[in-house]
Amino acid sequence: MTTRQPLYKSLYVQVLVAITIGILLGHYYPETGVALKPLGDGFVKLIKMVIAPIIFCTVVSGIAGMQSMKSVGKTGGYALLYFEIVSTIALIIGLVVVNVVKPGAGMHIDVSTLNASSVAAYAAAGAQQTTVGFLLNVIPNTVVGAFANGDILQVLMFSVLFGFALHRLGSYGKPVLDMIDRFAHVMFNIINMIMKLAPIGAFGAMAFTIGQYGVGSLVQLGYLMACFYITCLLFVLVVLGGICRAHGFSVIKLIRYIREELLIVLGTSSSESALPRMLAKMERLGAKKSVVGLVIPTGYSFNLDGTSIYLTMAAVFIAQATDTTMDITHQITLLLVLLVASKGAAGVTGSGFIVLAATLSAVGHLPVAGLALILGIDRFMSEARALTNLVGNAVATVVVAKWVKEMDNDKLASELASGGAPLVDTRPTDDLGVAEGPAR
């Protein structure tokens, strides 16, 4: 009989308490809350420090260990098909909701009175985003540069090529694969150590958010925020829930399974902060390493459902608030632009805002200065974006794994039924051979 872990030792409880304390401190002592920003920034930087090597190890081990290269192409093809379908649904849902509810109607904002300088940096970054530029950026100038900059797509591309090359070498490349597998164990143990600081990071990030923007900013544009949060919730429960039911599992149980990762994301507003743990969690759920290694990292740029909902809602909200006419032609154009632009977002705080700036610049019909309207609440909306993105990528991993028959359904059922035990830090045995994330 196993002894139940005390509540105070649960990462879930620790992060939840830290977020609560951070909110209270930021509200009652805003200056102190703002000063705690480095705690949140430091934690996110620690996570980002190991994301590139973990993706490399996971993808290379998964691809090099596969029996056939055809299965890699099949997995990638199914993943991109799923991403495109579901993210398009998310864009359309956001567009429909904002047109029905009209959260910006009646504000009658004069664009000339807006402080365009406050969003100049975002607008400049957005103007540089082009489809060709995005595609070329997937190819790193140097391998070292890809890892040094922590660019997920660049690291992923090199990892796929490295995995293919290692697979072609057969037994000759086995020593290299073994070394990479053992290196993966080291990296996952580093993650386990870093995650002990998650409550401190979540506390600092939340205290800063409330201290900097205040609870008042939540009320100021609360209608838009409420619409967005409710839309994200309905998307998760109805759309993703329907996809889950169609594939024989429950989205509620899946959310319960990744509850610790969701709380980390809630505290940091960045789905990227949970990426290393998601790789381990989804593999433990029963998905093959090759599927997890391709779907999760790729999903962080191509399957951002929460960001997709946000982009259409925010763009039309700005049009409504500034009395800018948006007929059906303009809205279809907006949707088509976002089908491409939304794939350039990444799972980091602020990327959605930059893509929104790029979209407004590309459409031309919408005032870029209107970004100033939602700048103050964007930080609060990023929580819902990041949470929806994380759940969306978890669902995508299970669904794609089922499509390509690389899912252990018995393991999936048992893990979801148990709620998932916390990831523990144990040392692998010398004869383990292949890394499988943190030891079970």
UniProtKB/Swiss-Prot annotation:
Signal peptide: none annotated. The chain crosses the membrane at residues 15-35, 46-66, 78-98, 146-166, 190-210, 224-244, 291-311, 332-352, 354-374. GO terms for biological process: L-aspartate transmembrane transport. Pfam families: SDF. Residues 420-440 are annotated as: Disordered. InterPro entries: C4_dicarb_transport, Na-dicarboxylate_symporter, Na-dicarboxylate_symporter_CS, Na:dicarbo_symporter_sf. The keyword Manganese does not apply. It is found in: Cell inner membrane. One of its GO terms (molecular function) is malate:proton symporter activity. It is a multi-pass membrane protein. Disulfide bonds: none annotated. The keyword Transmembrane helix applies. Keywords: Cell inner membrane, Cell membrane, Membrane, Symport, Transmembrane, Transmembrane helix, Transport. GO terms for cellular component: plasma membrane. Gene3D superfamilies: Sodium:dicarboxylate symporter. PANTHER family: AEROBIC C4-DICARBOXYLATE TRANSPORT PROTEIN, PROTON/GLUTAMATE-ASPARTATE SYMPORTER. Belongs to the dicarboxylate/amino acid:cation symporter (DAACS) (TC 2.A.23) family. Responsible for the transport of dicarboxylates such as succinate, fumarate, and malate from the periplasm across the membrane. This is C4-dicarboxylate transport protein. It comes from Pseudomonas putida (strain ATCC 700007 / DSM 6899 / JCM 31910 / BCRC 17059 / LMG 24140 / F1).
